[in-house]
Amino acid sequence: MEVRQAINSDYAKTLDTDGLRKAFLVDQVFERDALKLTYSHIDRIIVGGVMPVARAVEVPSSLGKSIGVSYLLERRELGAINIGGDGWVDVDGTRHTVRNEEAIYIGQGTQAIAFGSDDAARPAKFYLNCAPAHTSYPTRTISLAQASPQTLGDPATSNRRTIYKFIVPEVLPTCQLSMGMTKLEPGSLWNTMPCHTHERRMEVYFYFNVADDAAVFHMMGEPNETRHILVHNEQAVISPSWSIHSGVGTRAYTFIWGMVGENQVFGDMDHIAVRDLR
């Protein structure tokens, strides 16, 4: 598991392209038949992915030792969204089907977790967010139809999109983790513009459905000190609470957002007018 230290805003604005990418970009989320994780000191979130192809992939109990516990979810909760083929997740001996564009929430205290695919020719790809937790809530799967949808934007501003809120208080209880998926309509390129920050939560964006010859320019930094990170398919960007988080693609794309922090109020944002950005 790779560890990333927290970076403050004064230091971040001194970084060059390579420095920004090393600090905030997770450039490989999936690896065949492996669990890949990145641990951020920012609100102690763990992000990563698992792609079971030839075999099921278990979360090793030894992983807990790297965070000072006996097993990963002894003091944590986990959310996963499947962006690949249909698959399943075994949670303490109970198998849960998780199809494409479906999610699963796994509560604190779960000891045995394994991920699998229904078809090795079209493997599941489970994108994961894991956060500290203080109590245990039930494991549950969430389909796209069960997610809370919100359509925003306009074709005239190239930002027509639908936000599917999978792991949010109006759908199911969690300690602090929130996750969802935003799908841009064809011809729309911008996400989250006008942009915002939220001092009370950090966020991670995971971009996918990005064409091989396309890219997304992810905007970050303080509103008066903006920077960008060029992102390709199936890459993630860690966004501290002091940073804006927005993006524009050369084509439409989809991304998963995950938040942890003080609260779970989706609308608790500090909005920034486009004219005030620098």
Curated annotation (Swiss-Prot):
GO terms for biological process: D-galacturonate catabolic process; D-glucuronate catabolic process; pectin catabolic process. Binds 1 zinc ion per subunit. Keywords: Isomerase, Metal-binding, Zinc. Coiled coil: none annotated. It is an enzyme of class 5 (isomerase). The keyword Isomerase applies. It catalyses: 5-dehydro-4-deoxy-D-glucuronate = 3-deoxy-D-glycero-2,5-hexodiulosonate. Disulfide bonds: none annotated. Its EC number is 5.3.1.17. Its cofactor is Zn(2+). InterPro entries: KduI, KduI/IolB_isomerase, KduI_N, RmlC-like_jellyroll, RmlC_Cupin_sf. It holds the Pfam family KduI. GO terms for molecular function: 4-deoxy-L-threo-5-hexosulose-uronate ketol-isomerase activity; zinc ion binding. The keyword Metal-binding applies. Pathway: Glycan metabolism; pectin degradation; 2-dehydro-3-deoxy-D-gluconate from pectin: step 4/5. Zn(2+) binds at residues 196, 198, 203, 245. SUPFAM superfamilies: RmlC-like cupins. Belongs to the KduI family. Catalyzes the isomerization of 5-dehydro-4-deoxy-D-glucuronate to 3-deoxy-D-glycero-2,5-hexodiulosonate. This is 4-deoxy-L-threo-5-hexosulose-uronate ketol-isomerase. The gene is kduI.
